[in-house]
């Protein structure tokens, strides 16, 4: 999981979700697209 100050969807399968006040990008098709904002 990579940490960025601004997160973006890297493919059409990526989803942006909020958990515990943090924003995450989750991608089941390509797990290397996982990101966290902070």
UniProtKB/Swiss-Prot annotation:
PROSITE patterns: RIBOSOMAL_L36. One of its GO terms (biological process) is translation. Keywords: Ribonucleoprotein, Ribosomal protein. The keyword Ribonucleoprotein applies. It holds the Pfam family Ribosomal_L36. GO terms for cellular component: ribonucleoprotein complex; ribosome. GO terms for molecular function: structural constituent of ribosome. NCBIfam families: rpmJ_bact (TIGR01022). PANTHER family: RIBOSOMAL PROTEIN. Belongs to the bacterial ribosomal protein bL36 family. HAMAP family: Ribosomal_bL36. This is Large ribosomal subunit protein bL36. The gene is rpmJ.
